[in-house]
Regions:
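Catalytic domains of cell-wall/extracellular-matrix polysaccharide-remodeling enzymes
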Residues: 124-195
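Boundary/entry segment of secreted carbohydrate-active catalytic domains
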Residues: 21-72
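Structural recognition of the beta-strand scaffold that forms the well-ordered cores
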Residues: 43-45, 63-68, 93-98, 124-130, ...
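Functionally critical loop-and-helix segments that line ligand-binding/catalytic clefts
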Residues: 26-43, 55, 173, 177-235
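Acidic (Asp/Glu)-rich catalytic clusters
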Residues: 53-61, 80-92, 113-122
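Bacterial Sec-dependent N-terminal signal peptides
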Residues: 1-24
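Charged helix-capping and loop-helix junction motifs
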Residues: 79-82, 112, 140-145
Length: 235
């Protein structure tokens, strides 16, 4: 989730943000036509980049918060525990994500993640942030299969895959991965349904502004409604 943001700083993109997430209409206007916005669920994803969050000031229409936990085989987000505990105490559906490194073994990345993340009933499944390309596409796919299977066996729930649209088309447009929930990052204002076989979460901007967080934050929709979101959580 941070590589895509870094790349986007190299180009000029204007995305307006408001403190009321449900009042913000993203550029992907097809979304308003194809979905009932009243039934969508709003969320943010955060890491140490957001620094100190004033949780009591966050907008009421935020339902879920996904928090960076680990990256590769060694890195642990320095704000994870604080953010994880605070999200739970403030009543949010919370999730943890791992930033996947393609040239690091899936086994060492799995050990890093489970050393930090202890999921409980009502938490979102683990999220795998896969956005770094590899010239060895087949190996990357096989390693991701191993990593996803390790997570599923350990947490007893099927992981969520986060990626951007080009990464999805190159690496995940394969029937094996259809079993997973997909969280797609796409800020270009194009029809997501025309290029994706399936998606459940949509990260529509990385330039969001909300009360309680200084600077920008990623904003997201879950498209199937609150009850459905609760249903995919850890039982």
């Amino acid at each position: 989730m941070n590589v895509l943001k870094t790349l986007l700083t190299l180009i000029l993109i204007t995305v307006s943000g408001t403190n009321n997430i449900s009042g913000e209409k993203p550029r992907n206007l097809f979304f308003l036509d194809s979905l009932d916005v009243k039934d969508t669920v709003h969320g943010i994803d955060i890491s140490f980049y957001q620094k100190k969050i004033q949780w009591h000031k966050l907008p009421n229409d935020i339902c879920f918060v996904v928090i960076k936990a680990t990256e590769g085989s060694k890195l642990k987000d320095t704000k994870f525990k604080e953010n994880w505990d605070s999200a739970g105490k403030n009543g949010y559906i919370r999730g943890a994500y791992h930033f996947y490194r393609p040239y690091v073994t899936p086994y060492s990345q799995f050990r890093n993640f489970i050393s930090v993340v202890k999921l409980k009933k009502g938490d979102l499944p683990p999220v795998v942030d896969a956005e770094i390309h590899s010239k060895y596409t087949k190996k990357l796919q096989n390693d991701l299969k191993i990593f996803l299977n390790l997570l599923e066996r350990y947490y007893k729930v099927k992981p969520i895959i986060y990626c951007n649209a080009p990464f999805y088309r190159k690496h995940f447009y394969h029937s094996y991965f259809d079993q997973y929930h997909f969280w797609i990052a796409d800020y270009r204002g194009k029809n997501l349904d025309s290029t994706m076989k399936m998606w459940d979460f949509w990260q529509y901007t990385c330039w969001g502004n909300v009360n309680g967080i200084k600077g920008y934050v990623d904003k997201n929709y879950y498209r199937w409604g609150y009850d459905s979101l609760k249903n995919i959580c850890v039982k």
